[in-house]
């Protein structure tokens, strides 16, 4: 297959864009019924409302990883999420199960901030500075190659749901941890566990150097200089505005927000925690939510008895997380129905071998 043929194969035909929503909903419903248990559609909380109704499971990264690991029936897993999630699903399922991503452009800018070549350059420098005292810990929002490196070096993956438990375990294994790619989740979790900010360093992958003014012996956490482009846009000013204009409103944010924002919020937690906390709250309560716009909108719809707003009123959905839509889902399902293979996510055996070590450590500890 030449490059032009590859591009044509990976490009959704224009006819899907001209179908009505009703036509697409009917076709997706029909194909799901025909395929039955051979098809499984996991969907992350951040996905568009137009695809969520077709999900067989909705959850955060930890929930979806656990669900993928336990699903042995489905021949086809069509992941409504992003690339790193589909990679994780492929590694946790059997070789006979096929994982596809409806739109290959669906990604995570934070995961892309940690490149495997940057990590392999960083590791010997950190070993030179600290010796064999570092355990690597990677957020599940990372590439399979990053997970594999971490697993090969005795480390583990982590999600926002289990971060406190996993980081606590990691700090018992070695004197310090190297947390990547999200500096904010790493900082917020370590601080919650009692590690002072002055004992945390930054690793700058662009300059390939450590940013730290303190005594190296005091450094307990090394944070990769990465972040979520969505959660970094929630600010202290946003919180001040809520406190001023809505003094009875409770503020809950995702721990990918900056330390300043998390410290000033009333609570923080994973998407699962945010959904559960608000769902279980008393009618009439007021909430400002600091996370992705699609999820905030869905929480508002599902809780009409409460007043809920986005912490940042100008927040947009994550543009890379937001790629998968109804036309791409239908395109993928029709390919499966016709016996065609499109947009398969397949991680090579060597990468899978060590990445699984990191993932399985996390799942066992969770």
Curated annotation (Swiss-Prot):
Location of the protein in the cell: Cytoplasm
Gene Ontology terms: cellular component: cytosol
Keyword Glycoprotein on entry: no
Enzyme Commission identifier(s): 2.5.1.72
InterPro entries per record: NadA, NadA_sf, Quinolinate_synth_A_type3
Keywords of the record: 4Fe-4S, Cytoplasm, Iron, Iron-sulfur, Metal-binding, Pyridine nucleotide biosynthesis, Transferase
Keyword Ribonucleoprotein recorded: no
Pathway: Cofactor biosynthesis; NAD(+) biosynthesis; quinolinate from iminoaspartate: step 1/1
Residue positions binding iminosuccinate: 44, 61, 139-141, 160, 254-256, 271
Cofactor note: Binds 1 [4Fe-4S] cluster per subunit.
Family designation: Belongs to the quinolinate synthase family. Type 3 subfamily.
Protein name per its UniProtKB record: Quinolinate synthase
């Amino acid at each position: 297959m030449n490059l032009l043929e590859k591009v044509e194969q990976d490009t959704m035909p224009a006819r899907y864009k001209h179908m009505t929503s009703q036509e697409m909903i009917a076709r997706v419903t029909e194909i799901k019924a025909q395929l039955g248990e051979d098809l499984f559609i996991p969907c992350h909380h951040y996905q568009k409302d137009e695809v969520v109704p077709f999900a067989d499971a909705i959850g955060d990264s930890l929930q979806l990883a656990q669900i993928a690991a336990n699903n042995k029936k489905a021949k086809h897993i069509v992941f409504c999420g992003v690339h790193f999630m589909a990679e994780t699903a492929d590694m946790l399922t059997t070789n006979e199960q096929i994982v596809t991503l409806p739109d290959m452009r669906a990604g995570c800018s934070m995961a892309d901030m940690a490149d495997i070549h940057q990590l392999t350059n960083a590791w010997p420098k950190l070993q030179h500075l600290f010796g064999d005292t570092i355990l690597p810990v990677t957020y599940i929002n990372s590439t399979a190659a990053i997970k594999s490196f971490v697993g090969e070096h005795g480390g583990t993956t982590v999600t926002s749901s289990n971060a406190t438990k996993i980081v606590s375990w990691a700090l018992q294994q070695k004197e310090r941890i190297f947390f990547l790619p999200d500096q904010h989740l790493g900082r917020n979790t370590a601080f919650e566990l009692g590690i002072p900010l002055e004992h945390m360093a930054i690793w700058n992958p662009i300059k390939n150097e450590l940013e730290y003014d303190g005594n190296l012996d005091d450094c307990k956490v090394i944070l990769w200089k990465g972040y979520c482009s969505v959660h970094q846009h929630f600010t202290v000013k946003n919180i001040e505005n809520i406190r001023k204009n809505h003094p009875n409103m409770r503020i809950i944010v995702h721990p990918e927000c900056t330390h300043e924002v998390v410290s000033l919020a009333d609570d923080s937690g994973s998407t699962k925690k945010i959904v559960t906390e608000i769902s279980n709250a008393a009618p009439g309560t007021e909430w400002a939510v600091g996370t992705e716009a699609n999820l905030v909108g869905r929480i508002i719809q599902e809780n009409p008895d409460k007043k809920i707003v986005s912490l940042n009123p100008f927040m947009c959905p994550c543009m890379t997380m937001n790629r998968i839509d109804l036309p791409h889902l239908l395109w993928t399902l029709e390919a499966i129905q016709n016996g065609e293979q499109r947009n398969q996510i397949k991680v090579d055996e060597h990468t899978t071998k060590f990445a699984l070590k990191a993932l399985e450590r996390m799942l066992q500890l969770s």
